[in-house]
Amino acid sequence: MIKTYLVIPFLKYLIRKEAFLILFSLVRATIKERRNDGSDSIFHSKPDGKKTILALDSLRYRGDLDALSQNFRVLHLTQRAPGWLIKGFYHEFDIVNYINAPDGSDKKAQYIAASNFMTKFLRVFYSKVSVDCVTTVNFRYTEDHHWVKSSEKNSIPHIMLYREGMVVYYRTEYEVFRRAKRFGKFLGSHIIVHNVKCKNIFLDAKFASKSKISVAGALRMDSLVSKVNNYHKYKKIKRNKKVTLFYFHPNTPMFGVDAKGVTPKALLSHGPKKDLSYAFNAWSGRFDLFYDVHEAIAKLAYKYRDIDFIIKPKDIMVASPQWKYYDKAIEKSGINVSNLENYFIEPYANVHDLIFSSDVVCAMNSSVVIESALIGKPVILPVFKEYRDSKNFEDFHWKDDLDLFDVADDKHDFERLILQRLDDDDIPKEVEKGRKELFYTYFDQPKEGAIDKYTSIINDVVESYKNID
């Protein structure tokens, strides 16, 4: 195994010598093709009439690459290789500090050197790899910045498939606005967003012109909407009743973050219209709420062996140091869940399949709340009264829509609501209507399907770029 301390100096040497062919070979080895069956291959097919997308930072797309692979040849790579190429130019890794550095400064010189290097490298890269456009999911990552900027210089358009569409409460809206202002102008040809709220934030920040931003919904929601329209087929399946808790950790931003007396950057620039200082004082009851939620689930699983209880974390959560709080919660519950045949932790389960197969869904600041609501599932929000009475509740996604869900006041009420909703899953018509409106506020799915609209936009951008050349 090659040691990191040997690899880094070698890479720096290759970059300094502009050994582009060797660097190309190293980067090419990290690029995979997403097949239309969802598999990845290090062997790339020929375009065969399909336009080719090169997706940067591929781990952040979730199901989007699978959807795009139906209509495009999709090549993708993680941030690792672009990071190799760029990190040696910088002493710190907040790209905004270099973008906005004054002319003549060391930081500006480093920024220009990195940009010039990447432009020359990509000239070689694109001469050997057929690519029609580059996509990203955000504009804030240093690893992506020079790649997309230099791609445009090499006549390869950059299209951002912006994924942070859950701009539900004021602080998230403000943070997206503030970040866009700090970055200045969008480095690319087009932005596709999930909803009108995102588009308006970018317009207000003068990040991009109206003609450069399209609202097209979310690719991964096409299958959900299709399944909802055929939901009668799923209801016929007989099985044990199932309760699913979509996992959250106690240090999630909805509970606030301790700033330790330092005035947060968010309060210093492009002044917010509201006082956001509450968000930088973490709610003291967050651990108790977290432990109570898991104690309630564990005790119900112990008592009701004919009901399945699922904990659904993201896979990265299980690997995170934050997972120790889950272990502590189970220890505090006094229940040995490893001995329960009806208690499961499912980090790799398909989210939509899990929602459809569940009788009751429990979640917090997650899009699964409105996804489950659209399907017609009872959704329980364990936003206990003490949290609702705190200032940090301002950052709870669904604080203005509690009437569309079941809201638990404490752990005992949480247990009661789960059992009640297992027996009675009725959703009143007016609540169904409100839930549907809420879902389409954040996922503005076109009637023809998001994939058709994305395909049309991407094709138009690529063709218009060719016409300019």
Where are these regions (language model features)?
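Donor nucleotide-activated moiety binding/catalytic core segment of transferases
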Residues: F121, A282-G285, L289-Y291, I316-I370, ...
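Active-site and donor-binding regions of nucleotide-sugar-utilizing enzymes
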Residues: G38-I42, L54-D66, Q79-K227, V369
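A nucleotide-sugar donor-handling region in carbohydrate enzymes
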Residues: L23-G38, K185-D288, R435
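A conserved nucleotide-sugar
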Residues: A298-K314
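Catalytic binding pocket for nucleotide-activated donors in carbohydrate/polymer assembly enzymes
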Residues: D327-N336, L340, S367-F443
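C-terminal amphipathic helix plus adjacent low-complexity
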Residues: K12, D275-F280, K411-D469
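N-terminal subdomain of nucleotide-sugar transferases
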Residues: I2-Y90
